């Protein structure tokens, strides 16, 4: 599943925000 990858991507996006 790509949930882990998506979560990581979202976390990075939020961290950059």
UniProtKB/Swiss-Prot annotation:
> Do the record's keywords include Magnesium?
no
Q: Tell me the superkingdom of the source.
A: Eukaryota
Q: Name one GO cellular component term.
A: extracellular region
Gene Ontology molecular function: toxin activity
What coarse category fits the chief subcellular location reported for this protein?
secreted
> Could you tell me the keywords of this UniProt record?
Secreted, Toxin
Q: Does the keyword Chloroplast apply?
A: no
Subcellular localization, as worded in the UniProt entry: Secreted
Tissue distribution of the protein: Expressed by the venom gland.
Similarity section: Belongs to the cationic peptide 04 (cupiennin) family. 05 subfamily.
What name does the UniProt record give this protein?
A: Short cationic peptide-5a
Print the organism lineage.
Eukaryota, Metazoa, Ecdysozoa, Arthropoda, Chelicerata
């Amino acid at each position: 599943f790509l949930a882990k990858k998506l979560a990581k991507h979202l976390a990075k996006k939020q961290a950059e925000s």
